[in-house]
Amino acid sequence: MGLAKETTMGGRGRVAKVEVQGKKPLSRVPNTKPPFTVGQLKKAIPPHCFQRSLLTSFSYVVYDLSFAFIFYIATTYFHLLPQPFSLIAWPIYWVLQGCLLTGVWVIAHECGHHAFSKYQWVDDVVGLTLHSTLLVPYFSWKISHRRHHSNTGSLDRDEVFVPKPKSKVAWFSKYLNNPLGRAVSLLVTLTIGWPMYLAFNVSGRPYDSFASHYHPYAPIYSNRERLLIYVSDVALFSVTYSLYRVATLKGLVWLLCVYGVPLLIVNGFLVTITYLQHTHFALPHYDSSEWDWLKGALATMDRDYGILNKVFHHITDTHVAHHLFSTMPHYHAMEATNAIKPILGEYYQFDDTPFYKALWREARECLYVEPDEGTSEKGVYWYRNKY
């Protein structure tokens, strides 16, 4: 694994190099006002990229769910395989089904952005169905995620994976800054991080009172949004009760093998994808004195997940474009990304480090944020790792 090293150049708006051993150095995202506007970026994108086709979007749902069903049918034949192939078959199924259902999760996420079709009610019905099946409170998360898009990169108002300044880092964090502590932290984050965020707002924006995606009166939501939280909760209760009935008929072990472990993999990938999109030593964060929407939207990182880019419907390698134009359907996002890259220039960031290496590297290098020493840019924060 390559080692990261920063080279800093003085002056406002400077571009520091972040060197990764064996790779071309990545430049820090400039923190000055971009020399282009959102309107100019939109004009560079072919108009058809903004068109949402109901038929095309549904074709991806059918495609993913068809393969999910095929994978499930395959499990009914595992008992016919000789040892040890029957034991090997289950982990293969878990990985394949987990990756595929992550793609389903992404489509539901797209529904929440009104990027699935021209019809809001269709998007919400499809999104509610798909997300509830994956135990996600659709409307509850849609609302908080919308706020994330409105406040990306803001240390004061962003909703998730908000880094802390060194002075606010937990006292025990320095004792986890070693390979064993890092491995344990990642294991916990990837396995229970997502449900802990939904239930208790762990790693989310701090609020003055209890914040939970299941609580209609949580401070995350306004009065006019509370009914939607109830709808999400009822949908989740219905799915949970259905799973309980399945467990009584087929057994808990069967349910965990067919549904539980793939869902665990979905949750792990979701945390990985989100974390790596917004955590990188080349990305700035801003306090209220420096933040604006466009600078925050550009403080995101496109990543390369290999063949999984396609399985995950390119949420991984077109995330910059997604933050700029979130109602654009995923099947046009790559074309749009290629169209705006020449305009974005050094404001566009792409890291092709394999995601599993990047996850470990970022967990080691990106522990807290601080402004650069000796500069006037006190509202621009960069990742550090030295206690």
Curated annotation (Swiss-Prot):
InterPro entries: FA_desaturase_dom, Fatty_acid_desaturase. Keywords: Endoplasmic reticulum, Fatty acid biosynthesis, Fatty acid metabolism, Lipid biosynthesis, Lipid metabolism, Membrane, Oxidoreductase, Transmembrane, Transmembrane helix. It is found in: Endoplasmic reticulum membrane. A motif (Histidine box-2) lies at residues 145-149. It comes from the Eukaryota. A motif (Histidine box-3) lies at residues 319-323. It is a multi-pass membrane protein. ER (microsomal) omega-6 fatty acid desaturase introduces the second double bond in the biosynthesis of 18:3 fatty acids, important constituents of plant membranes. It is thought to use cytochrome b5 as an electron donor and to act on fatty acids esterified to phosphatidylcholine and, possibly, other phospholipids. This is Omega-6 fatty acid desaturase, endoplasmic reticulum isozyme 1. It comes from Glycine max (Soybean). The gene is FAD2-1.
